[in-house]
Amino acid sequence: MSEFKRIPPEQAQALREQGAVVVDIRDPQTYALNHISGSQHLDNHSISDFIRAADLDAPLVVVCYHGNSSQSAAAYLVSQGFSDVYSLDGGFELWRSTYPAETAQGNPE
């Protein structure tokens, strides 16, 4: 894949169940209040370490607030060598309304 794909929450959930990595690019405070269970917070400070440690061929779902910023982040990750990247349409807001039980609270790890 040379480009990322935009996907709805249902497809993102299916990818999660298959072991996809989910990264959340919202601000740290918002992430701490509520995020997709098992997701990792990703920002300008952590992205280099994330890329260095990541499996570039593993499915990667990028989440933001409403599905806009995640597209730019997904395109960047593709440019860094990731081969299977997805942007969550509707972002965390649509995710939360679709899968309210699949959310968690707490600070980024």
Swiss-Prot record:
Active-site residues, as the UniProt record annotates them: C64
Domain Rhodanese: 16-104
GO molecular function (one): thiosulfate-cyanide sulfurtransferase activity
Disulfide bonds: none
SMART domains linked: RHOD (SM00450)
EC numbers, comma separated: 2.8.1.1
One annotated GO biological process: glycerol metabolic process
GO cellular component: cytoplasm
Its job: Transferase that catalyzes the transfer of sulfur from thiosulfate to thiophilic acceptors such as cyanide or dithiols. May function in a CysM-independent thiosulfate assimilation pathway by catalyzing the conversion of thiosulfate to sulfite, which can then be used for L-cysteine biosynthesis.
PANTHER family to which the protein is assigned, alphabetical: FAD-DEPENDENT OXIDOREDUCTASE (PTHR43031), THIOSULFATE SULFURTRANSFERASE GLPE (PTHR43031:SF6)
Name of this chain's protein: Thiosulfate sulfurtransferase GlpE
Gene name tied to this protein: glpE
